[in-house]
Regions:
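Redox-cofactor binding/interface segments in oxidoreductases and associated redox assembly factors
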Residues: 1-3, 91-92, 110, 227, ...
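Phosphate-binding loop of NTP-binding sites
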Residues: 4-137, 142-146, 165-168
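A short acidic, often aromatic-flanked loop/helix-cap motif at beta-alpha or helix-coil junctions
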Residues: 29-33, 144-148, 266-267, 294-299
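Nucleotide-sugar-dependent glycosyltransferase donor-binding/catalytic pocket residues
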Residues: 47, 157, 206
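ATP-dependent carboxylate-amine ligase
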Residues: 53, 128, 154, 163-338
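A short glycine-threonine-serine/GTX helix/turn-capping micro-motif
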Residues: 149-155
Length: 338
């Protein structure tokens, strides 16, 4: 089973082809695995993992015992999977390689559409084609907006909660029971995940996700935040640099700081000529400090622990970011104890 990220020159993939071993894309494999369920597919540029987890939680609380497959780990699940025995399945489906077309769901949610892997116009066309083939309820966040109270912070999460609530009620869940279920939602790993009262970790990696994360923490901590962020790839940074610069220049307050790490290098044939330096040059004076690696980021944060009300690590791909958040939380807790 392979993803689109696996290049044709990958040694394991080449050996599989040489030996005649069948190779299947992960989307096709998951679609087959869920073919016996009434599938609800959750698509969109931002918020898919959170909405998938919210919907799974609501359906479970309403007695449907769904089978769920998410793009992120969920507390209380078996990692990213909830192995329910009911007839309904909920799955996050991926637009980054347009592999969502491998799925044939009964119902669907589209959270939103923005320029990320493709232009907004191309993303809209992909999502329009996807939902056109859905026979059951469709909740499309591009056209229908609302908010519902939910246990996790941020206006974006209240909007996510509304989409999950709408689809759950369309499937027959009692509206009030579904609303109450959102108040006991336990969150998703790496989605403003708290490591103590002053440290958070988030998966944010595009302008929309970073804006949601930053504004949520800024509202909670008006005295200032420090965010450690690593761009997750050279191609995404090249595509989003101008939008990232505009977003950071809009949200970073005088009392805030962005600690900018080098681009995460996952190998392969990427064009590495544009890096974090290019983004840093476009940010307003004093907004950004560049650091060489996670150790340097940790040392900088420790030296400035009293300068900010809260710290956050964020970015995709780099497995070391949650560990940095945990270490920072430990340092701050030790200092608080004296």
């Amino acid at each position: 089973i392979v993803s689109t990220a696996i290049e044709s020159a990958n040694p394991g993939l080449r050996r599989a082809h040489e030996r005649g071993i069948p190779v299947t894309h992960r989307a096709a494999a998951l679609s087959r695995a869920l073919s016996g369920h009434k599938l609800v597919a959750v698509a969109g540029t931002c918020g898919k993992s959170t909405v998938t987890a919210m919907l799974g939680h609501i359906l479970a609380e309403c007695g449907l015992d769904p089978f769920c497959v998410n793009g992120a780990n969920v507390p209380g699940w078996e990692g990213a999977v909830r192995a329910g025995k009911g007839a309904v399945a909920v799955a996050e489906v991926d637009e980054s390689d347009k592999s969502l077309v491998a799925f044939h769901p009964y119902a669907a949610i589209v959270t939103n559409a923005s320029a990320d892997h493709y232009s907004k116009e191309e993303m809209d066309a992909v999502f329009d084609a996807f939902v056109a083939g859905v026979p059951g309820p469709v909740v499309d966040g591009r056209r229908e907006r609302g908010e519902m109270p939910v246990s996790v912070p941020g206006r974006h999460n209240r909007a996510n909660a509304y989409l999950a609530w709408r689809l759950a009620t369309a499937l027959g869940c009692d509206a009030e029971q579904a609303r109450r279920a959102l108040l006991t939602f336990g969150g998703v790993e790496r989605r403003l995940q708290a490591y103590g009262p002053r440290v958070y970790d988030d998966y944010a990696h595009n302008p929309e996700k970073l804006h949601a994360m930053w504004t949520t923490l800024a509202e909670k901590f008006p005295d200032g935040i420090c965010v450690v962020w690593r761009p997750h790839g050279y191609a995404p940074l090249r595509k989003m640099k101008d939008a990232l610069a505009a977003m950071f220049n809009a949200v970073i307050r005088p009392q805030d700081k962005l600690l900018l790490l080098p681009v995460y290098d996952a190998g392969g044939t990427a064009d590495r000529t544009l890096n974090s330096d290019a983004l840093a040059r476009e940010l307003k004076p004093g907004a950004c400090e560049q650091v060489a690696d996670l150790d340097a980021a940790e040392a900088w944060c420790a030296a400035h622990a009293d300068d900010f009300a809260a710290f956050a690590t964020c970015g995709a791909r780099d497995p070391g970011l949650p560990g940095l958040a945990a270490r920072l939380a430990g340092r701050l807790a030790a200092e608080a104890r004296g």
